[in-house]
């Protein structure tokens, strides 16, 4: 399977509340590293997951990767990753503002 298929599988697993399996699948997307858009989406989903579960250090690990590359991602993918970029920016700002 490629990164895009693993991403879809991970999202389905999250929807079914199969959290451990979803985390494993989304990490496979990152390890495969065959599609920058899928990797970015997987990192965003993982960052959101860890933010919601109050594991802020782990959330920062994933979201900071997007936050640091937002100009590059916007230039290369135009609006395709705008939601992921916005999510990473908002959550990073919240963690900085509230010292989470």
PLM region spans:
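Residue signature of alpha-solenoid helical repeat architecture, marking inter-repeat boundaries
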Residues: 1, 37-39, 83
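Terminal, low-structured helical/coil segments at or just beyond the last alpha-helical repeat
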Residues: 3, 76-100
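Flexible helix-coil transition and linker loops at the boundaries of alpha-helical arrays
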Residues: 31-36, 71-81
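TPR/TPR-like (Sel1-like) alpha-helical repeat modules
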Residues: 54-75, 93
């Amino acid at each position: 399977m490629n990164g895009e298929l693993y991403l879809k599988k991970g999202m389905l697993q999250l929807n079914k509340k199969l959290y451990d399996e979803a985390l494993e699948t989304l990490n496979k997307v990152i390890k495969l590293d065959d599609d920058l858009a899928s990797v970015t989406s997987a990192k965003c989903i993982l960052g959101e997951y860890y933010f919601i579960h109050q594991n802020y250090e782990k959330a920062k690990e994933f979201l900071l990767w997007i936050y640091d590359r937002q100009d590059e991602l916007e230039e290369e993918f135009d609006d395709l990753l705008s939601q992921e970029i916005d999510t990473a920016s908002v959550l990073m700002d919240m963690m900085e503002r509230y010292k989470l």
